[in-house]
Amino acid sequence: GERGYEVTLADRAKEPGGRVSQESTLPGLAAWARVRDWRVGQIQQMANVRVYLDSFMDDKAVMGFGAQHIVYATGASWRRDGVGNTNRDTIKGAGGAHVFAPADVMEGRVKKGPVVVFDDDHHYMGALLAEKLATDGMEVVFVTPSAVVSEFTLLTLEQGRIQTRLLELGVTIRQQTNIAEIGTDNLRLACIFTGQESELAMGSVVLVTSRVPNEQVYHRMAKHPDVMETVGIKTVALIGDCLCPQTIAAAVYDGHLYARELDADQ
């Protein structure tokens, strides 16, 4: 918009912001909403940028819109099969109706306890979901193959406070432990060193393991360069998490870089 282009933003959601709008509802992350709010304020001052919320566009609508440049910012989705840093194959039993992903917690769909949060991502998400569930009154067990909760946050000097917070809330922590199998009302756990197994009763399981980019729409479009040329589309690009699951800061940088480099060769 600042470079003078006519820009149309079609957002499938009813509010702008993508994952920022979701994650800023988690305990302690309200300030993250400013990442969205500042940009919304800037866009509202630009006559050449139009925003359409609750506006899903299929391939046909994109093709017929008349834009010369198409940018997909469709994000990434948390896996529901348990594949992550430790498990390279689907965890047995991961397809059950009592097995959830992070979005289900943020949208209030996890109702039955005890809840096991399995964190094989090791960043901030698993611990925050456990904190939210605990403050909502659920009995929570935090299971992780790591030696500590949210191992990545050792680099940001937050790890001690995060683990202390969970313990203060009564969250049970099972470290250096993997999930071998998900049953209907219990888990079969395994020590990551010896493989020794144990059982853990549960009502729901939340898998926080890894994310996959929502890139399918881009690839469908990119397969038809002849059609794109016919309708006047010059370029199609991916930015943010749908290019590669990353931090919010990196996704913002990705979008800014695209905007700076558009038509740079002309």
Predicted regions and their residues:
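Gly/Ser/Thr-rich beta-alpha loop segments that engage phosphate groups in nucleotides
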Residues: R19-V20, S77, V212, C242
